[in-house]
């Protein structure tokens, strides 16, 4: 059995993140999106889940409401989404994709599918299940740590 140094795992996770950002950054810029602001996730989630409130979308995309608001403004200006009064709560809006937004979201979905295939191509089912379980554990550890250190401004953004 090979003994893996813990620091090597951290380094590999960091490298994976860097390459992931580079790959997705290029892919999404090619179709006219800004990936660092969550635009692809917003479009994909609206395509998959349909119209929803800004807060529900922010929670689903794991974005604070300030970032979400600015990003929605940009996507609306680009003609990719619209905001309409929410009939069940007059103080909020329902965010939905326009026809152009659906087309762009389909492009995003294809990019994600290609990435999924690239991630899974080098592993069999058992390895994928083991990787999934391990990544869930790592995510859980970081999630717990993040909850302990969340800044007051983070909570303020989530309450809206």
Please give the residue ranges for each predicted region.
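C-terminal regulatory/oligomerization modules of transcriptional regulators
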Residues: 1-4, 126-160
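Charged, amphipathic alpha-helical coiled-coil/dimerization segments
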Residues: 73-143
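Short capping segments at the starts of secondary-structure elements
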Residues: 49-53
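N-terminal leader segment of winged-helix/HTH proteins
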Residues: 1-33
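Residues within helix-turn-helix
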Residues: 54-55, 66, 73, 93
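Pre-recognition alpha-helix immediately N-terminal to the DNA-recognition helix
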Residues: 23, 41-44, 103, 107
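The alpha-helix within a helix-turn-helix
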Residues: 58
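Short, locally clustered residues in the helix-turn-helix/winged-helix DNA-binding domain
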Residues: 17, 44-48, 109
